[in-house]
């Protein structure tokens, strides 16, 4: 089954003429690397999409993809800082004036500042749920042995590749903040100058594997062949992600930082690790069957509300070919209707 949702990316296609000015962190990129140099002149920026794709652009503007990394704003409708910077906290040895960018807005917020001319991630984060400061050390991450000192945790090497668009490992610069149109559709200059279906990447027109790779490039815990970058340097939408990134896989009966012993997710950013284990993945379903990244009325950009069973029951309701072997949902779950135990995701996600 494959629904006719148009794309996984942030904007259906790109149009109008122009170019984006590369911006971003300072610092020395690698002198030699196995990946090709990124031609940032081929990027035009998401604002160029609006003229021809306004509905998709407007929807994307309200998504979490467009709110991933932003300058600090403490009040008003465009507020980006929700952490409490008043007073002192033993976990926080930096102040709001030191913050250059804010990462995240839903579960937690991390903060980027400049140290010795390089942008780094500060060692404390704000929990949006618990409303308090927490240490951010990264001890369980594979890159920690190389970056035990937080002053070496380069925003560009560990974060920017998935939090910005058109990041170049050599120049240590990005084209646009946040996960914008060209993050999922690839460089759009050629298409903007002469719009055609075949001169822009449309994830909806890719094979199932390559379409899913677009999402997994940032929604899959793993590592590259080297130890320098924590994102798939060199990958472009439409390419085979496995040539740039190796996703972690669970080991039966073993609990890791990413997985419980039964193989289910132990932390965030592992959707791309658990989904390939599922029957849905092996049946040809794509991320876009359940998620609409051009914008949705629901959290997590799902096509139907995910905080109920509505989304799952679209395909798995009683009487459906792939539904439960019972007449009613509560007969299937053995839990009272509307209770937590009756929610599909409690057992199946």
Predicted features along the sequence, with ranges:
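A gly/proline- and charged-residue-enriched helix-loop-helix capping module
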Residues: 139-143, 152-159, 164
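Short glycine/proline-enriched loop/turn "hinge" motifs that connect secondary-structure elements
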Residues: 150-153, 280
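Second-shell loop/turn segments in exported
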Residues: 45-46, 145-149, 171
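Primarily the internal scaffold of c-type cytochrome electron-transfer domains
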Residues: 22-40, 47, 55-131, 135-140, ...
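Hydrophobic alpha-helical membrane-insertion segments, chiefly the h-region
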Residues: 12-23
